[in-house]
A protein has these predicted regions:
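Hydrophobic transmembrane alpha-helices of multi-pass small-molecule transporters
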Residues: 12, 178-179, 240, 247, ...
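Hydrophobic alpha-helical transmembrane segments that constitute the membrane-spanning cores
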Residues: 181, 185, 250-255
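C-terminal transmembrane helix pair
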Residues: 218-219, 224, 244-250, 254
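Interfacial loop-to-transmembrane junctions
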Residues: 222-243
Length: 264
């Protein structure tokens, strides 16, 4: 626990610096986390004999983030173009029998699950930087509230076959705590309609917990405890960012919808 706390105290100032500084800091931070996350993700499958197109995905991830930041192309065009290139390269490998179809599917899954999902933080940084904080409130705020609620009040297991320690009471506490934290955020940044953020916070906490359980299900399926050991006390990048991968897209599209409603 002490190691976990120390790691958190080291990483939090770094996170604050990246978000507050914005621009190139967020671009590099998201890109580096995506590349490390991909490495951890593919390593799990390689241990069971799969052969994902790692080099191709690493290159395409760099291209995607760079195009997002500097090209002026629309996000959807970039993602579709990169996905097409991955399929094209994979098809050539399959025809030459260098990989199997399932290897390509794992490659595509890794690409969507990690760099595409996480890249929504970059999208937020372009014109809605303050809302990046919600990505982390929905993920880490929810996790913290769920942890302490479960510790003191947890009696009924949530999904014990995937995560034995999580409880229904903890999950509910995570949602309630996230709503309260989000209202504090809305008040601090003087949002004109904070009530709009309540359903977003509830969905955000729920999605965060689903992201955590999804990552846990993969680990349990392949018989591993952590995705890596890069962060002492926490595991790898994916162990720390499993919920972030799910809350980043939700936050972006949720804020886009709220902005649309407010402008009607």
């Amino acid at each position: 626990m002490l190691t976990r706390i120390i790691s958190g105290l080291v990483l939090l100032p770094l996170l604050f610096f990246v978000i507050i500084n914005g621009g190139i800091s967020i671009y590099l931070g998201a890109l580096i986390c995506s590349l490390i996350g991909l490495y951890e993700f593919f390593r799990v499958f390689e241990g069971s004999g799969y052969k994902p197109l790692k080099t191709t995905i690493y290159a395409m991830t760099v291209i995607m983030y760079t195009a997002m930041t500097y090209s002026g192309m629309s996000y959807s065009h970039i993602v579709i173009s990169v996905t097409y290139l991955i399929f094209a390269v994979g098809a050539v490998y399959i025809m030459n029998r260098r990989i199997r179809v399932e290897d390509l599917m794992i490659t595509i899954m890794g690409y969507i699950y990690i760099p595409v999902f996480l890249s929504h933080i970059n999208l937020l940084s372009m014109d809605q930087t303050i809302y990046i904080w919600l990505v982390f409130i929905f993920a880490w705020g929810s996790d913290t509230c769920a942890y302490f609620t479960g510790m003191f009040f947890g009696k009924h297991k949530l999904i014990p076959e995937i995560s034995p320690k999580k409880t229904i009471e903890g999950a509910i506490g995570g949602v309630v705590g996230t709503v309260l934290l989000t209202l504090v955020f809305a008040r601090y940044f003087q949002e004109p309609n904070p009530i709009y953020f309540i359903p977003l916070a509830m969905i955000g906490s729920t999605v965060s917990q689903i992201g955590d359980l999804f990552a846990s299900a993969i680990k349990r399926e392949f018989g591993i405890k952590d995705y890596g050991n890069l962060i002492p006390g926490h595991g790898g990048i994916l162990d720390r960012f499993d919920s972030i991968l799910f809350t980043a897209p939700l936050t972006y599209y949720g804020i886009t919808f709220i902005t649309y409603i407010q402008n009607l």
